[in-house]
């Protein structure tokens, strides 16, 4: 009996082991998530795993970063090469064609193996932001019906706006008032002299002033997992990789948007006032989050064949890099 009491006492003295934290991409989709939303999340999460799960934490700091866009390194499956995967995002989303006037684009359309075309393509991948190509690739892989594939995020933001309250496959919503859900996209405006927020974006879209505005969108893969009041997003070409971002949610499930300042509105990854002496200015989540694209489609496009050739987007060739 004394021995049993001794064991119990020793057990109480043992340090508590930390609970295993769940990975947002490893949790099965909750009840009620549509089939197309499941497909979008699965495609985005699959790519995030390939890139060794880098992420930006709730404080807007890069907490982990593995291989990057132009490296000749294997991804997590030990088969795909990093730069070739990015070239695949361009090719397989039908967004490479509109970039044809830009040096190196034609080389990315060629099979890998030639030293000249490989180097030319890798230079193209470095010089031309591929985040919209990544989004378009995910939507293609998930067979989202009617999605506007484009090398510019603003094109599908505009399409969601033009669709109105019944827009398909996405409708435009205010991220400050509507709750994000898996399969949605959250977007910010960049390289502007001042912040606009949702109201300013709506005014600009209504007057036709958005043109080739620079913007950036990321895919919602989980929201408030286990009541943690955290939004989990995945985007491409974030720190030159496929990165997960964490944002805080309020008690109602709406995003607690970090307030953008003049510095973060005019830059994308590196904030102007961020320095070792001013750590409080270093927050990659402090952006002009102006658009929440709510997924309205519920079922993937019928008879989808991921290996079939895709028609090019309706956009004209783009003479200069225009997207992030």
Predicted regions and their residues:
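Bacterial N-terminal signal peptides
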Residues: 7-16
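Sec/Tat signal peptide C-region and signal peptidase I cleavage site
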Residues: 17-21
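Surface-exposed intrinsically disordered loops and tails
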Residues: 71-76, 83, 92-120, 162-170, ...
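Short, well-structured beta-strand/strand-turn elements
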Residues: 142-150
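Low-complexity, Gly/Ser/Thr/Pro-rich intrinsically disordered linker/tail segments
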Residues: 240-324
């Amino acid at each position: 009996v004394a021995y049993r009491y001794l064991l119990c006492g020793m057990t109480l003295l043992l340090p508590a082991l930390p609970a295993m934290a769940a990975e947002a991409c490893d949790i099965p989709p909750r009840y009620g998530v549509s089939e197309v939303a499941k497909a979008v999340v699965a495609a985005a999460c699959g790519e995030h795993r390939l890139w060794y799960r880098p992420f930006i934490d709730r404080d807007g700091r890069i907490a982990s970063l593995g291989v990057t866009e132009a490296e000749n390194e294997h991804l997590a499956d030990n088969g795909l090469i990093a730069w070739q995967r990015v070239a695949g995002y361009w090719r397989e989303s039908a967004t490479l064609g509109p970039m044809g006037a830009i040096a190196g684009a034609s080389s990315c359309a060629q099979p890998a193996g030639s030293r000249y075309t490989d180097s030319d393509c890798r230079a193209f991948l470095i010089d031309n932001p591929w985040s919209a190509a990544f989004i378009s690739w995910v939507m293609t892989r998930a067979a989202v019906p009617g999605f506007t594939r484009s090398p510019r995020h603003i094109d599908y933001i505009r399409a969601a706006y033009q669709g109105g309250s019944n827009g398909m496959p996405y409708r435009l919503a205010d991220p400050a008032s509507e709750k994000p859900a898996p399969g949605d996209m959250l977007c910010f405006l960049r390289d502007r002299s001042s912040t606009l927020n949702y109201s300013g974006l709506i005014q600009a879209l209504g007057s036709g002033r958005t043109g080739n505005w620079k913007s950036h969108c990321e895919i919602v893969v989980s929201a408030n997992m286990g009541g943690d009041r955290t939004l989990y997003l995945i985007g491409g070409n974030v720190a030159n990789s496929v990165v997960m971002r964490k944002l805080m949610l309020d008690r109602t499930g709406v995003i607690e948007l970090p307030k953008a300042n003049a510095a973060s509105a005019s830059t994308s990854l590196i904030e102007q006032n961020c320095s070792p002496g001013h750590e409080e200015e270093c927050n990659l989540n402090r952006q002009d989050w102006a658009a929440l694209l709510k997924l309205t489609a519920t079922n993937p496009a019928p008879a989808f064949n991921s290996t079939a050739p895709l028609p090019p987007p309706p956009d004209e060739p783009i003479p200069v890099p225009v997207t992030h």
